[in-house]
Swiss-Prot record:
The gene is ELN. Keywords: Disulfide bond, Extracellular matrix, Hydroxylation, Repeat, Secreted, Signal. Transmembrane segments: none annotated. GO terms for cellular component: extracellular region. The modification 4-hydroxyproline is found at residues 32, 67, 102, 176, 189, 192, 211, 276, 345, 363, 368, 441, 455, 480, 576, 635, 720. Disulfide bonds join C739-C745. The polymeric elastin chains are cross-linked together into an extensible 3D network. Sequence repeats lie at residues 83-127, 219-262, 263-318, 319-393, 394-482, 483-554, 555-619, 620-686. This is Elastin. Residues 1-24 form the signal peptide. Residues 83-686 are annotated as: 8 X tandem repeats. The keyword Signal applies. Major structural protein of tissues such as aorta and nuchal ligament, which must expand rapidly and recover completely.
Length: 750
C-alpha cells in the first residue's frame, strides 16, 4: 500500500500547492513568516523556499514567503528528505538569511534589502535531492542555517548591476525562485521590484486588462498611446522611486527660469534655472519672461524721452534713453539739450506749442525753441515809423493853378496864402505824422514802414507822385489834370495814395474810415497841396467879384472851392486821394441833384459876368432884370459879397425864389455866389442861357451844398444857417463867420 500510494503523493502535493492556503507555506502562523521547520503542515512538503530545517520565511512585514514553483521541497520519500530543492532560498539570502531574522525581523530586513538591492549570495545551501529543479540560479553549497555575510560595505549588500531586475539574483527578482513569475522583465532597469511593489511584468500593473490605456477624463475617446495627454494619470505605471515625479517637478522649476544654454551635468539641472540663459552672468543670455517684461518696461520709458542714437549697453535703465546718464535731457544723443535728437512726436508737439506761445525763434540761430525762443523773430523793430515819409511837402499848394486871377475881384482870389486851410493842412499833417509813413520799406510792422503792411502805404507816391512839385500844385494842378480830369473822378488823388495810404500805414480799415470822413466833407482839399477847399482865399470871398460867376474863384476852372484842383475833391489834400469811389460817387450824386453846370466862359450869358468888380447896389452884376427870373439880378452884392438882399425876385405864385440855382450868373442871390457853374441850373443858368456852355468845371462848383462867400448867412429856403467855424467856414460852409465854438469849431456833435 505504501508503495502504491507513493506515486500518488506528488499529485496530491501539487494540488495542495496550488491552493492559496498552501501557498503560504506550511501552517500559517506557526512561525512568523514561515512554516514548520523541516516538515511543515504536510510532511515532506517542506517550506518551499527554505533549505533543510530552515523554517523561518522572509516574507515582508511578517508575511510568509510565497513559494516558488520549485518550492515543493524535495521529493524524497514522503518528503522526509530536507526540502532544500533548487527553489527555496537556494543560494541563501546573502547578508540576510531567513533564519537570522525569523518573523517580523525578517520583514524589516527584506524591506531594507529590497531598497538597497540584495547582496551577493553567500555559499549556497545543499541542493535538494531529486525533485523538479527550480528556475532560479542556485548558489554554491551553502550551509543551511548559517548567516552568510554579504560583500556590501558596512554590512550593506552591494548593488549588482545587471540586465532585467538587478539584485542578488539577476533575472530572477529579489528572492530566488521567483523566476517564472518575474522572468527578468523589469519596468526600468535598476529599479528593483518585489513584494510590496507592484509587479510590472506582462499582464500586470496599471495597464493590465486595459487595452489602449485609460480614457481621458474630459473626452470620450482614448488618448494616443493609451494615456490621456497632459493628465496626471499619465504617470501611471511608473513605480514609486523611479524619479518621474521629481524629474517633472525639476523640469517645471527649470522652465520657470528659462532653459539654460548649458544643460548641466546629471543631478545639477544646469545652472540654467538660476540665471536664465547661461547662468552666471545675468542678462547675457536669452532671458526669461521676467527679463522680457523688464526690457519692455524700460523700452516704454525710453520711448517717453525719445529713442537714443546709441542703444547703450544695459547699464542704468531709463536714465537716458539709449545712451544715458542724464535722463531725458536730450532725446537721441544727450549732452547738449535740444541739439539734435529725433525726439518723440509728443515732445515735438509740446515744443512747438511753447514756441508758438512766445513766437517762433530765428531759424538757424542757436537752438530752436531754446535761448532766443522768446525773441519772436525781428518783428519787434517796427521800421522807422517816426519818419512819416515826405508827406509834409504837400506840393506847392499855394499856387493852385492860376485860380486867383478869376476877374480881378478882391484880394486876388486864388493866390493868397490859404488862410484857415493852412491850419487845417497842418492839423491833418500832424495827424498823419502821428502814424508816420516810415522810410525803410520792408521792415517793421505793416503800416509802420511803407512796403510792409498795406502795399503803397507811405513811401510809393507819398502824398503826391513826385512829392509836391511835379503834378502837384504846379503842373497839372488846378487846371489841367487836377481840377477836371482825375479829380473827384477815378484817378483823382495820386496813384498809390488814394485808398491804401490815406493815412500812411493805417491799413484798409483806417483808409475806409478816412474815406468815409472825407466823403462827408467832400474829397481832399483840406490840406494844402492841390486841395482847393482852402487854397486861394480870394476865391472864397474876397472881392465882390469872386462871388460873381465867371470871376469868382469859387467856380470857374481855377477858382477856389471847385476849380481845377480846388473844390472839395482834389485828391491831394491832407487826406490824399479824393477818397474812395464812394466819396466820388457821393459827390457826383449830390452834384447831379442840383444839376451839373456845363461850365464855360464866364460872362457868356448876361449875368454871368455881372459887374466885374461887382458894383454894390440894388442890382449888382450886369444884371438881367431883377425879379423877373428868380436869382437873376438879385441885389446883395453889397458890402459883403453875396450878402445882398435875398429873395428880391418874384416868382409865379408869389413864391420866393429858390436858391438852389447857384451859378446862374446872378451874384449874391441868397448869399450863394453866382458863377458856381455846376450847380443849380444845370446847363443853362437862365434857361438856355445861364452860365452858358462851359461855364465852370463840369462836376465841380459849390452847388447849393457849399455856399461860398464870407457872408453866406442865408440858409436854404430862408432857414437860418448852421454855424460852422474855423476852416469849414472859410471853405464855404454857411455860417463860417462869427463862430464862437472855440475848439469845437467844425466838429460834429454826437
Amino acid at each position: 500500500a505504501r508503495q502504491a500510494a507513493a506515486p500518488l503523493l506528488p499529485g496530491v502535493l501539487l494540488l495542495f500547492s496550488i491552493l492559496p492556503a498552501s501557498q503560504q507555506g506550511g501552517v500559517p502562523g506557526a512561525i512568523p513568516g514561515g512554516g514548520v521547520p523541516g516538515g511543515g503542515f504536510f510532511p515532506g512538503a517542506g517550506v518551499g523556499g527554505l533549505g533543510a530545517g530552515l523554517g523561518a520565511g522572509l516574507g515582508a512585514g511578517g508575511k510568509p514567503l510565497k513559494p516558488g514553483v520549485s518550492g515543493l521541497g524535495g521529493l524524497g520519500p514522503l518528503g522526509l528528505q530536507p526540502g532544500a530543492g533548487v527553489g527555496g532560498l537556494g543560494a541563501g539570502l546573502g547578508a540576510f538569511p531567513g533564519a537570522a531574522f525569523p518573523g517580523a525581523a525578517s520583514a524589516a530586513a527584506l524591506k531594507a534589502a529590497a531598497k538597497a538591492g540584495a547582496g551577493l549570495g553567500g555559499v549556497g545551501g545543499i541542493g535538494g535531492l531529486g525533485g523538479v529543479g527550480g528556475v532560479g540560479v542556485p548558489g554554491g553549497l551553502g550551509v543551511p542555517g548559517v548567516v552568510q555575510p554579504g560583500v556590501g560595505a558596512a554590512g550593506k549588500p552591494p548593488k549588482v548591476p545587471g540586465a532585467g531586475i538587478p539584485g542578488a539574483f539577476p533575472g530572477g527578482g529579489v528572492l530566488p525562485g521567483a523566476g517564472i513569475r518575474f522572468p527578468g522583465v523589469g519596468v526600468l532597469p535598476g529599479v528593483p521590484t518585489g513584494t510590496g511593489i507592484k509587479a510590472k511584468g506582462p499582464g500586470a500593473g496599471a495597464f493590465a486588462g486595459i487595452p489602449g490605456g485609460y480614457r481621458l477624463p474630459f473626452v470620450n475617446g482614448l488618448g494616443p498611446g493609451g494615456i490621456g495627454a497632459g493628465v496626471l494619470a499619465g504617470k501611471a505605471g511608473y513605480p514609486t522611486g523611479t524619479g518621474v515625479g521629481a524629474q517633472a517637478a525639476a523640469a517645471k522649476a527649470a522652465a520657470k527660469y528659462g532653459a539654460g544654454v548649458l544643460p548641466g551635468a546629471g543631478g545639477i539641472p544646469g545652472v540654467g534655472g538660476v540665471v536664465p540663459g547661461v547662468g552666471v552672468v545675468p542678462g547675457a543670455g536669452v532671458g526669461g519672461p521676467a527679463a522680457a517684461a523688464a526690457a519692455a518696461k524700460a523700452a516704454a520709458k525710453a520711448g517717453a524721452y525719445g529713442a537714443g542714437v546709441l542703444p547703450g549697453a544695459g547699464g542704468v535703465p531709463g536714465v537716458v534713453p539709449g545712451v544715458g546718464v542724464v535722463p531725458g535731457l536730450v532725446p537721441g544723443v544727450g549732452g547738449i539739450p535740444g541739439v539734435a535728437g529725433v525726439g518723440t512726436p509728443a515732445g515735438a508737439a509740446a515744443a512747438a506749442a511753447k514756441a508758438a506761445k512766445y513766437g517762433a525763434g530765428v531759424p538757424g540761430v542757436g537752438v530752436p525753441g531754446v535761448g532766443i525762443g522768446g525773441v519772436p523773430g525781428v518783428p519787434g523793430v517796427p521800421g522807422v515809423p517816426g519818419v512819416p515819409g515826405v508827406p509834409g511837402v504837400p506840393g506847392v499848394p499855394g499856387v493852385p493853378g492860376v485860380p486867383g486871377v478869376p476877374g480881378v475881384p478882391g484880394v486876388v482870389p486864388g493866390v493868397g496864402v490859404g488862410g484857415p486851410a493852412a491850419a487845417a493842412a497842418a492839423k491833418a499833417a500832424a495827424k498823419a505824422a502821428a502814424f508816420g509813413a516810415g522810410r525803410v520799406p520792408g521792415v517793421g510792422v505793416p503800416g509802420a514802414v511803407p512796403g510792409v503792411g498795406v502795399p503803397g502805404v507811405g513811401v510809393p507816391g507819398v502824398g503826391v507822385p513826385g512829392v509836391g512839385v511835379p503834378g502837384v500844385g504846379v503842373p497839372g494842378v488846378g487846371v489841367p489834370g487836377v481840377g477836371v480830369p482825375g479829380v473827384g473822378v477815378p484817378g483823382v488823388g495820386v496813384p498809390g495814395v488814394g485808398v491804401p495810404g490815406l493815412v500812411p500805414g493805417a491799413g484798409p480799415a483806417a483808409a475806409a474810415k478816412a474815406a468815409a470822413k472825407a466823403a462827408k466833407y467832400g474829397a481832399g482839399g483840406l490840406a494844402p497841396g492841390v486841395g482847393g477847399l482852402a487854397p486861394a482865399v480870394g476865391g472864397l470871398a474876397p472881392g465882390v467879384g469872386g462871388l460873381v460867376p465867371g470871376v469868382g474863384g469859387l467856380v470857374p476852372g481855377v477858382g477856389g472851392l471847385a476849380p481845377g484842383v480846388g473844390g472839395l475833391a482834389p485828391g491831394v489834400g491832407a487826406v490824399p486821394g479824393v477818397g474812395g469811389p464812394a466819396a466820388a460817387a457821393k459827390a457826383a450824386a449830390k452834384a447831379a441833384k442840383y444839376g451839373a453846370g456845363v461850365g464855360g466862359v464866364p460872362g457868356a450869358v448876361p449875368g454871368a459876368v455881372p459887374g466885374v468888380p461887382g458894383v454894390p447896389g440894388v442890382t449888382p452884376g450886369v444884371g438881367g432884370v431883377p425879379s423877373l427870373v428868380p436869382g437873376v439880378g438879385v441885389p446883395g452884392v453889397g458890402v459883403l459879397p453875396g450878402a445882398g438882399i435875398p429873395q428880391v425876385g418874384v416868382q409865379p405864385g408869389a413864391k420866393p425864389p429858390k436858391f438852389g440855382v447857384p451859378g446862374a450868373g446872378v451874384p449874391g442871390v441868397g448869399g450863394i455866389p453866382g458863377g458856381l457853374g455846376v450847380g443849380g441850373l444845370g446847363v443853362g443858368g437862365l434857361g438856355a442861357g445861364g452860365l452858358g456852355a462851359g461855364v465852370g468845371v463840369p462836376g465841380f462848383g459849390v452847388s447849393p451844398i457849399f455856399p461860398g462867400g464870407v457872408g453866406g448867412q442865408l440858409g436854404f429856403g430862408g432857414k437860418p444857417p448852421k454855424t460852422y467855424g474855423g476852416a469849414l467856414g472859410a471853405l464855404g460852409f454857411r455860417g463860417g463867420v462869427g463862430c464862437a465854438q472855440g475848439k469845437y469849431c467844425g466838429r460834429k456833435r454826437k
